[in-house]
Curated annotation (Swiss-Prot):
GO terms for biological process: translation. It holds the Pfam family Ribosomal_L36. SUPFAM superfamilies: Ribosomal protein L36. InterPro entries: Ribosomal_bL36, Ribosomal_bL36_sp. This is Large ribosomal subunit protein bL36. The keyword Hydrolase does not apply. Belongs to the bacterial ribosomal protein bL36 family. It comes from Nostoc punctiforme (strain ATCC 29133 / PCC 73102). It comes from the Bacteria. Keywords: Ribonucleoprotein, Ribosomal protein.
Length: 37
């Protein structure tokens, strides 16, 4: 899980979602997991 100021899709399988008011990126590749903070 990377915590970043700006979250972006890294590959085409990444999807940007909102959970509990936080913007997150979830993907089949666990290295692509990000959250805004």
């Amino acid at each position: 899980m990377k915590v970043r100021a700006s979250v972006k899709k890294i590959c085409e399988k990444c999807s940007v979602i909102k959970r509990r008011g936080r913007v997150m990126v979830i993907c089949v590749n666990p290295k692509h997991k990000q959250r805004q903070g």
